[in-house]
Amino acid sequence: MAQNPDVANLGLAPVTVRHDHALRGSGQALYVGLCDDAFVVASEPYGLVELTDRYLRMDGETPSNPDDPTGSRGQIIELEAALAGTLEGIRRRSYDGSELPVTGDELTHAEITTRDIDRGHYPHFLLKEITESPVSFRKTLRGRLGTDGNGRLRAVVGDETLPPRLRSQLAAGAIDEILVIGQGTAASAGRAAAAATAERLGDRDISARSPPATELSGFQLENDLSNVLVVAISQSGTTTDTNRTVDLVRARGAGVVAIVNRRGSDLVDKADGVLYTADGRDVEMSVASTKAFYSQVAAGFILADAIAGEVGVDDGDRRHSLLAALSQMPAAMEATLARRPEIAEAARQFAPARRYWAIVGNGPNLVAARELRIKLSELCYKSIAADSTEDK
């Protein structure tokens, strides 16, 4: 067990005396990097890029034998030290013992580098990421706001986000439910995205809601989800609960669009379409997610407008007003950050003197209240309530 104080993430690896050379993963992704005369095994590409940009992603979900989907799901990889760093040094089998030879075209080249996780001059990642929030928001909007024939703003997403199949289903009315899922902060952003989607769809016969990923997979799955579009939100793209839910809904016919911050992540491989926050490499290292949350909300609003356009919603003036306000958010965020000394003084004055805290809000502000509760709980280790104003 090891902990990096700058990152504040915890890593666990089970080791037995009899098999001290073995590493077992379940749910979380596992990557094998090919270096010069060495293999590197990590749960994310960020653990590899200092040494190599080539890696093999293990696939624990796809059965190797369709006639035995349960027994053949999962992979075992043996790495030969004498052939380290080569394809010949990798032996891959499924859980039922079937050989799965590795070919060169299965290797992925990383789109990220160590520059993407540089802390710069900041004392810790949290301050760096809070300060970068307006820039991340701008990057998320960049290239995704266009105009219609009347000069009014509209969302622009390509086929990499909404593939032709999903566009056709939306236009034909084959999709009548949109589920926005995530865990933790991503679930908070999902509430905002679902509310924006419902508002943009108006009186169309399409529902939009935001259950946590675990609630959907544990209690709300139906056998046939071919009428459902799932929007999965994850900063890292490796959130186990979210990714497992994506596997389950796809197996039942649902389409999946991911809002994700990390290129080459597990969720990117699983989704039908991807909308990257910022430029897909605006890495967030602090456990207390900040800039990713804002970017996820921005991406959720962009996707909501794009979906509304595909189903034929035509309210150009209202759409323009919403997107114009969205484009002004980075400047408002910068103005707020400029008041850091005043905010610090308020924190010093009120926080230590109050033992019990509660955060309240209404409507869209309730989303912010719930997210702020998560942030304060993570950073201050306090149990804090978040409610609608009337309930307090």
PLM feature spans:
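Short acidic (Asp/Glu) and glycine-rich catalytic loops that position anionic groups and cofactors
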Residues: T108-A110, I117-G120, T277-E284, A306, ...
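A general structural motif
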Residues: P212-A213, T336-E342, I384-K392
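Structural motif
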Residues: G11-A13, D20-H21, A29-L30, A38-V40, ...
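N-terminal segments that mediate ammonia production and transfer
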Residues: M1-D176, T185-A186, A194-A195, E199-D203, ...
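Glycine-rich phosphate-binding loops that contact phosphosugars or nucleotide phosphates
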Residues: G173-Q328, N362
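Acidic catalytic cores of enzymes that act on phosphate-bearing nucleotides/polynucleotides
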Residues: F350-K392
